[in-house]
Amino acid sequence: MQTHEIRKRFLDHFVKAGHTEVPSASVILDDPNLLFVNAGMVQFVPFFLGQCTPPYATATSIQKCIRTPDIDDVGITTRHNTFFQMAGNFSFGDYFKRGAIELAWALLTNSFADGGYGLDPERLWATVYLDDDEAAGLWQEIAGLPPERIQRRGMADNYWSMGIPGPCGPSSEIYYDRGPEFGPEGGPIVNEDRYLEVWNLVFMQNERGEGTTKEDYEIRGPLPRKNIDTGMGVERIALVLQGVHNVYEIDLLRPVIDLVATRAPRPYDPENEDTNHADNVRYRIIADHSRTAAILIGDGVSPVNDGRGYVLRRLLRRIIRSAKLLGIDSPIVGDLMATVCNAMGRAYPGLVTDFDRINRIAVAEETAFNRTLTSGSKLFDDVVGATVASGSTVVAGLDAFTLHDTYGFPIELTLEMAAEAGLTVDEKGFHELMLQQRQRAKVDAAARKQAHVDLTAYRELVDAGPTEFTGFDELTTEARILGIFVEGKRVPVVAHAVRGQAGITNRVELVLDRTPLYAESGGQIADAGTISGIGAGASSRAAVTDVQKIAKTLHVHRVNLESGEFVEGDTVVAVVDPGWRRGAAQGHSGTHIVHAALRQVLGPNAVQAGSLNRPGYLRFDFNWQGSLTGEQRTQIEEVTNEAVQADFEVHTFTEKLDTAKAMGAIALFGEAYPDEVRVVEMGGPFSLELCGGTHVHNTAQIGPVTILGESSIGSGVRRVEAYVGLDSFRHLAKERALMAGLASSLQVPSEEVHARVATLVERLKAAEKELERARQANVQAAATKAAAGAEWIGNVRVVVQRMSGPIAPDDLRFLVGDIRGKLGSDPAVVALIAVTSDGPTATVPYAVAANPAAQDLGIRANDLVEQLAMVVDGRGGGKADLAQGSGKDPTGIDAALDTVRAQIAQVG
């Protein structure tokens, strides 16, 4: 039974039983805690937790899933896959254990004619959680399983969760007995190669908390209602129904192995696993990883150096290296992507329609990694040789670090290659060096930001507690000075006079207990404003030029003292420049709107990679492969400005992190968030993000948004830049004035400028071609004329001339070679000299050519060029047959030509 038929029968079975068919979600979700969708129930989590009401009581789906913790085991065993399809049925407070067992048993054992898989009931086993007597009894009642074919297991095996806080519950697994050729009797607890798990029924009834293992986590309590979540691995059941030994031989994976076999000099030979294990593993790695890579790229992931993109990069690199170890030296990734997309295109049509993009991204990574392998492999071989020669079996951490830092070798690749050489790697030493490098980078960044301040000077204030930020509610705040710092040293008082003192750089910082001034973070630059004294200190004033956070909690105000003095403990007034804040809020809110527009136009996989917001300007970086089309840029700008025009209300509120994510709030992948987060909402579902920045009250306050351009800033990362508000208007006004000027100069209406310029460009190109033809004709004519005027100096035919009119050095070089060819086989020398222009900026290009017969006489073109150079204050070089140079003194041209003649006369 082909896989597409297996999928169809599964969905049909549950649709007939009243379930709603739900399409597979992307393997990427807006959840920073979840690298990839790793289970069929992930898209239904809010329903299980009771956070929202499902639109159906029961559902069925076949979900794309990716699991990468066991990536190093892929291929070594035949049970691990990084990508798989999870067929599932779900009940949200409808049926529970009885219904789940009845439906699963019917599909597995019903005949082909009745829409089932026709499995022999005598070969099916079940496992249940240790104390789940109810499930054990139902298996006996419904399926007629004898007690000896119902085995009990603990939390590690039969209590399911996603591995992170969320729904959980006891499970019951269904196993298929493949027969004695696969191992001894005794059921799943004895041998899971013989007894293959095909279906897992999870009785979702509790909510779990944090934990580090499958058994070590808190059960928070019951869910609002009892639910069912089941998962049947499509590849697993295909293995059984297609009668093959492992998943790599089913109809979805075997075509990839067959392709590789046509390119590799060594075969895939699972019948001789003991003697051919290493090559078989490489075949299986390529087959598995090719599918996963195609799915990831199809769902919008690009190969980069962190997060999901790094997983993709690692998969592609393992494919490429495995192919090389099989003896495949030519590019293969493009063919692999074509084979995978063809095999899986029926289930996932996007792999076919989006093939060009998928292929382009994968092949680009292959090209780049081949360069990495070429440059780093020699060093690795040297490292292995030195390690073995020293009698050690451990590659030094420093060597692994050098491979990573200099040649881009990921540590996983070094570990893999070392293992193949019978060595291990000092991973602890490697990670210590990586940590030191990261710490150096942080220190460098902090030093650049803090102008090399000793950050420990702030420790007492940091320990005292965070600065209270009042800037969301007010722009003016009365505060107390907690600390004053000059040149990184804490002082009790600072006065305006320090500006004039020798050796003082006027770097003054104030730390207050409260402030309305926003500290740079989240891509938004710091507020500008003032800090002033009150009462007796009213004459004291400082302009705030920057605000930075120390230890993420302490606001440090960098100021320029303008008058008076500040004393620790004084009360002051901190004021935000309202125009600056307004502009910064426009930029930050504009960034949210542009982000939402990007996701609407490009899809949810246009994931934020960074941003910068300042008054009137925004910059947004996002993961995307390839440049945007003109149409996409126009759409993004249009959607953005439509949102501005819609005058959406901007709401901010705090919420529990889990609740905010369940609402659909976008969080940055890899970012650490507290339990309570601030959510910024614009237009309801249009834009919902976790954000701690300042914003406008409604989107109309952003003003027009003009996208300036889009560019690449690294592999798989694009950047959009835009003006907002008044700056956007000014930019548009400038462009309008420019267009009006062009229209006036071209004497056409503005709307015809583009066509008119295109016509002029074509005319210019045609004229340039005509000029080039004329120039070449003139050069040919000059060559013919010069050859006709050749003179004899002794036995040598010579053309030694000053060319009339300016002539380019390249033309001069062509001329001497062409003339030399016209002078026949007798000894011949051609020396031409010219002047590029009149006046003090003139240069004197020259070129000399000597044919083989002249060289036999000892005449060398490069020697003659050296003689020319000395006379016209120049330099040059070349070979015996052709040389050229350039001088600065046109007055020496005649003398230079005489010098050439004299040199030839001495030989000829």
UniProtKB/Swiss-Prot annotation:
Chain's gene name: alaS
- Domain remark text: Consists of three domains; the N-terminal catalytic domain, the editing domain and the C-terminal C-Ala domain. The editing domain removes incorrectly charged amino acids, while the C-Ala domain, along with tRNA(Ala), serves as a bridge to cooperatively bring together the editing and aminoacylation centers thus stimulating deacylation of misacylated tRNAs.
| Top EC class of this enzyme | ligase
Identify the Pfam families for this entry. Answer: DHHA1, tRNA-synt_2c, tRNA_SAD
One Gene Ontology BP term is: alanyl-tRNA aminoacylation
Q: What does this protein do?
A: Catalyzes the attachment of alanine to tRNA(Ala) in a two-step reaction: alanine is first activated by ATP to form Ala-AMP and then transferred to the acceptor end of tRNA(Ala). Also edits incorrectly charged Ser-tRNA(Ala) and Gly-tRNA(Ala) via its editing domain.
Where it mainly occurs, coarsely classed, is cytoplasm
Q: Which UniProt keywords apply?
A: Aminoacyl-tRNA synthetase, ATP-binding, Cytoplasm, Ligase, Metal-binding, Nucleotide-binding, Protein biosynthesis, RNA-binding, tRNA-binding, Zinc
The Enzyme Commission number assigned here is 6.1.1.7
User: Of which family is this protein a member?
Assistant: Belongs to the class-II aminoacyl-tRNA synthetase family.
| Note accompanying the cofactor annotation | Binds 1 zinc ion per subunit.
Annotated Zn(2+) binding sites: H588, H592, C691, H695
Q: Which residues form the signal peptide?
A: none
Which HAMAP family does the entry link to? Answer: Ala_tRNA_synth_B
UniProt-listed InterPro entries? aa-tRNA-synth_II/BPL/LPL, Ala-tRNA-lgiase_IIc, Ala-tRNA-ligase_IIc_anticod-bd, Ala-tRNA-synth_IIc_core, Ala-tRNA-synth_IIc_N, Ala-tRNA_ligase, Ala_tRNA_ligase_euk/bac, DHHA1_dom
Cysteine disulfide links: none
> Care to name a GO molecular-function term for this sequence?
alanine-tRNA ligase activity
Which lineage?
Bacteria, Bacillati, Actinomycetota, Actinomycetes, Mycobacteriales
The question of whether Disulfide bond is a record keyword is answered with no
Catalytic activity reported: tRNA(Ala) + L-alanine + ATP = L-alanyl-tRNA(Ala) + AMP + diphosphate
- What is one cellular component GO term in this UniProt entry? cytosol
Question: What name goes with this protein?
Answer: Alanine--tRNA ligase
Obligatory cofactor(s):
Zn(2+)
Q: Where in the cell is it found?
A: Cytoplasm
